[in-house]
C-alpha cells in the first residue's frame, strides 16, 4: 500500500494554504537480483568470459519518489512528481548521478482538459508505445528491451527542459505531445526534442502510436544543457527519429501483443551504452537504422503466479553493414504479497551479419558479448512501497 502523507506532517518541507486539500505520496520500487551471463567482454573486441553479478533493476529500475497534488477547485489541481533512480547494490544515484533523474516536473491537471507539466519527463514514445511492449512493463523490463534500447521503450533517456500535454480520456482516446527546449541562445534547434502520441482503449483492446525526434544529441555541436544529454542516450547523432505503434488484446487472464518501431539516425558518431571499459563505439558519422518487430504475451496462471514471453526481430543498418538481431525472452514471477514478488527470467540473443562490426550480441543491461550469441538469466526480488 502506498503511504499517503499529509503535507503538514512533513515538518515544513512542503507548505499548503489552509483552505486547500493537499497531499504528498511517498512511493517506490526496489529490484535486486543475481544475473548470470554466458559471455561478457570488458573491452570491445576483447575476449569474452562468463559472469555472475549482483544487479539492481534487471526488470524495473529501483526508485523512490514523491508525488503531490493540491485541489484548486473546479476539477483543477496543481501536481508535481520528484522521482529518484538508484542502484540498490551500491547506493549510488542513477541517470548520470542526478538527484531526481527519473522524473522531475510540476504542472496543472484538469479532469476535463488534461494536464500540462514542465520539467524532466518521459517522451510520447515511452508513454504510449512503452506499455504495449514487455520492456515497458513489470513482465520483462530492462533486459527485454530492443537492441541497445534503440527506440527508448526502456526509458534509457528522459527529456530535460520539457513542456508536456496529456489529454483527458475522451471515450477511450488519449493524446499527448511534448517539446524539450535546447535552452541555447542562437541555437534553438541545437539539442531539442519533440514528440507526439495517441492511444485508444476499448475494453480488452489497446492501440497506440507515437513519433519522436531529437536534434544534435551528443554530436560535435551538442549543447550539453539541452533536451537530452549524452550520458543518458544510447547514441550520439545529428538527428534521431523514432516512430512506431502497437496493439494489445486481453483474453481473460491472457494478454497478447505486437509492437513495431523504427529508429533512424543521421550523422551517427557513436554507440554509448554498451557497457565496456573501452567507452563508446565509433559509428563513423554514418546513417543508422533499426527496425524492430516484437510479439509478446503474458498469462496469469493463478492470482499469484504469472508467465510472460517475447520474441523480437531487429533488422538494422550500421556503418554500411546489415546486422540482424533475434531475441527470445521469458519470465515467471510469483507474488508473495501485493507488494513483494520473486522472479526468474532469461534471454537469448543471436546476431547475424556482424563480421565487420566491433559489436557482438548485447542483451540490454548486461553488457556486450564477444560473439554473435549471448545468454542471460536473473533471479530476483521486487518490493513496492
Predicted regions and their residues:
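Sequence/structural signature of outer-membrane beta-barrel proteins
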Residues: 35-41, 87-91, 179-186, 191-192, ...
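Gram-negative bacterial Sec-dependent N-terminal signal peptides
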Residues: 1-21
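Residue-level detector of the transmembrane beta-barrel scaffold of outer-membrane proteins
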Residues: 25-27, 77-79, 115-117, 174-176, ...
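Outer membrane beta-barrel
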Residues: 22-36, 52-182, 190-192, 199-210, ...
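Outer-membrane beta-barrel "beta-signal"
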Residues: 336, 371-385
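Residues that define the transmembrane beta-barrel architecture of outer-membrane proteins
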Residues: 48-62, 99-102, 157-161, 190-194, ...
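Outer-membrane beta-barrel architecture
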Residues: 9, 13, 65-67, 105-108, ...
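Detector for outer-membrane/organellar transmembrane beta-barrel domains
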Residues: 197-327
Amino acid at each position: 500500500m502506498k503511504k499517503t502523507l499529509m503535507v503538514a506532517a512533513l515538518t515544513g518541507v512542503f507548505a499548503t494554504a489552509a483552505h486547500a486539500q493537499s497531499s504528498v505520496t511517498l512511493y517506490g520500487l526496489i529490484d535486486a537480483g543475481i544475473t548470470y551471463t554466458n559471455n561478457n567482454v570488458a573491452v570491445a573486441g576483447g575476449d569474452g568470459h562468463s559472469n555472475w553479478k549482483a544487479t539492481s533493476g534487471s526488470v524495473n529500475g529501483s526508485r523512490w519518489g514523491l508525488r503531490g497534488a493540491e485541489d484548486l477547485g473546479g476539477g483543477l489541481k496543481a501536481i508535481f512528481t520528484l522521482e529518484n533512480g538508484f542502484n540498490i547494490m551500491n547506493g549510488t544515484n542513477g541517470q548520470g548521478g542526478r538527484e531526481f533523474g527519473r522524473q522531475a516536473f510540476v504542472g496543472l491537471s484538469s479532469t476535463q482538459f488534461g494536464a500540462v507539466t514542465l520539467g524532466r519527463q518521459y517522451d510520447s514514445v515511452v508513454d504510449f508505445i512503452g506499455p504495449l511492449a514487455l520492456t515497458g512493463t513489470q513482465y520483462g523490463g530492462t533486459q527485454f528491451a530492443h537492441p541497445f534500447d534503440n527506440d527508448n521503450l526502456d526509458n534509457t533517456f528522459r527529456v530535460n527542459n520539457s513542456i508536456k500535454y496529456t489529454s483527458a480520456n475522451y471515450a477511450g482516446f488519449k493524446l499527448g505531445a511534448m517539446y524539450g527546449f535546447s535552452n541555447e541562445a542562437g541555437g534553438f534547434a541545437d539539442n531539442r526534442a519533440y514528440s507526439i502520441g495517441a492511444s485508444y482503449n476499448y475494453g480488452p483492446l489497446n492501440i497506440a502510436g507515437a513519433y519522436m525526434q531529437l536534434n544534435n544529441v551528443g554530436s560535435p555541436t551538442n549543447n550539453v544543457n539541452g533536451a537530452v544529454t549524452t550520458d543518458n542516450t544510447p547514441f550520439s547523432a545529428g538527428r534521431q527519429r523514432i516512430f512506431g505503434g502497437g496493439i494489445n488484446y486481453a483474453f481473460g487472464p491472457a494478454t497478447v501483443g505486437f509492437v513495431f518501431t523504427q529508429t533512424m539516425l543521421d550523422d551517427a558518431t557513436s554507440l554509448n551504452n554498451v557497457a565496456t571499459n573501452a567507452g563508446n563505439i565509433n559509428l563513423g558519422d554514418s546513417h543508422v537504422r533499426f527496425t524492430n518487430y516484437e510479439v509478446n504475451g503474458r498469462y496469469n496462471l493463478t492470482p499469484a503466479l504469472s508467465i510472460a514471453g517475447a520474441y523480437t526481430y531487429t533488422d538494422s543498418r550500421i556503418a554500411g553493414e546489415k546486422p540482424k538481431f533475434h531475441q527470445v525472452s521469458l519470465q515467471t514471477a510469483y507474488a508473495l504479497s501485493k507488494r513483494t514478488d520473486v522472479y526468474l527470467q532469461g534471454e537469448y540473443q543471436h546476431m547475424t551479419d556482424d563480421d565487420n562490426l566491433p559489436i557482438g550480441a548485447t542483451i540490454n543491461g548486461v553488457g556486450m558479448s564477444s560473439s554473435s550469441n549471448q545468454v542471460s538469466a536473473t533471479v530476483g526480488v521486487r518490493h513496492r512501497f
